[in-house]
Regions:
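C-terminal structural segment of proteins
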Residues: 1-355
Length: 355
């Protein structure tokens, strides 16, 4: 049986108290929310904090404020179930609710939080094993060893970014607010993740993720498509987030009603004359950080979203995707699926156009 190591558990009631505790206790302390990632890692001796600081009772981290026409703020301790069931998110940001609904199982979504999913540890077949298994192979570069078994000749850890919400947040242009005793800062989700399986976040250990800021829903739509072996529980071995913002043929942004809760997009306006003003395709589950496919975006921008452009964007995603043999399924097949899942995501966005 894998047991948790001994640790001190703290329950601050304010953000100021929480960041002071972590500043006072130093690098051997760590924040925890739902614990669905941290506690299994502690049982496997992948992470060994001596002080664990719960942020589940901080009021500011447990609320959603704002409105879609100017953007909303989501507290980092909102559970994934809260996100899936929230009426504002379902109505105005259905891609967020749809992506959150693909995460794990209902029981774990009841505990896991949106902030925890955005800070999820990178994953690898050689790392996500119990201590005895890892010891038998002399550990790995990510923890206690000196070789990346995925690419033994590389000095880099290739553990993959396996969050379902990260590609979506990068695609739609979300921002994250971090707070420490030194102050606070906002960082774009697109600039928050490093292409390194060990040092995978641009976040200091003393910083607390307080909330996520979503942009206004001004004419954009989005979709998230996930590849996994089972229809529940599994992490993505490929995730594709597609974001498209339209303008009319005369260059004006569309006007119309907000998207309903069907599908997984957001935005306003309809009609076959619209061209794409901005687009992003973001791949998750294939590299240490989310992969933005600029070539896919360029295939879409300035043109109507039709079959030819969708095919070109999907082909660009296939070319850019370079998964390694460090998770489920044969990596060559996962590369092939980058094309198919980009097609699915963009066709989903296209299907939302008449709503």
């Amino acid at each position: 049986m894998m047991r948790l190591p001994k640790f001190v558990y703290r329950t601050p009631r304010t953000i100021a108290e929480a960041v002071k505790i972590v500043a006072d206790t130093g690098p051997e302390s760590q924040f925890v929310a739902g614990g669905t990632d941290l506690y299994p890692n502690m049982k496997r001796r992948q992470q060994m904090p001596k002080t664990v600081i719960s942020v589940m009772r901080l009021p500011e981290l447990n609320q959603i404020t704002g409105e879609s026409k100017s953007g909303i703020r989501i507290g980092a301790s909102m559970t994934l179930t809260d996100i899936v069931e929230n009426e504002i998110i379902k109505r105005d940001y259905p891609v967020i609710a749809a992506a959150a609904h693909t995460i794990s199982t209902p029981i774990l979504r009841n505990m896991g939080t949106i902030g925890g999913n955005l800070l999820l540890d990178t994953r690898c077949n050689y790392y996500d094993q119990n201590y005895e298994w890892r010891k038998a192979i002399n550990f790995c570069l990510k923890k206690d060893g000196d070789v990346c078994w995925v690419a033994p000749g590389s000095s880099k850890c290739w553990a993959v970014q396996s969050s379902d919400l990260v590609p979506v947040m990068v695609a739609i242009g979300a921002k994250l607010r971090l707070v420490s005793t030194l102050g606070e800062r906002m960082i774009d989700a697109s600039g928050f993740y490093n292409d390194d399986g060990i040092d995978y976040l641009k976040k200091r250990p003393d910083e607390l993720l307080v909330d996520i800021h979503l942009p206004a829903t001004n004419g954009w739509r989005a979709s998230y498509q996930k590849l996994r072996r089972r229809g529940a529980f599994d992490f993505p071995v490929l995730g594709v987030a597609a974001y498209v913002r339209y303008e009319s043929a005369d260059g004006a942004l569309p006007h119309g009603r907000a998207s309903d809760t069907r599908g997984s997009g957001v935005g306003t306006g309809s009609g076959s004359d619209r061209v794409v003003a901005d687009a992003k395709i973001v791949l998750g589950g294939i590299a240490p950080s989310p992969v933005q496919v600029n070539e896919s975006a360029q295939a879409l921008i300035g043109k109507p979203l039709n079959e030819d452009q969708i095919q070109a964007a999907a082909e660009a995603a296939y070319i850019k995707a370079r998964p390694l043999d460090n998770t489920d399924f044969v990596y060559q097949w996962r590369k092939q699926m980058a094309r198919q899942y980009t097609l699915r995501a963009l066709n989903d966005v296209h299907s939302q156009s008449g709503r």
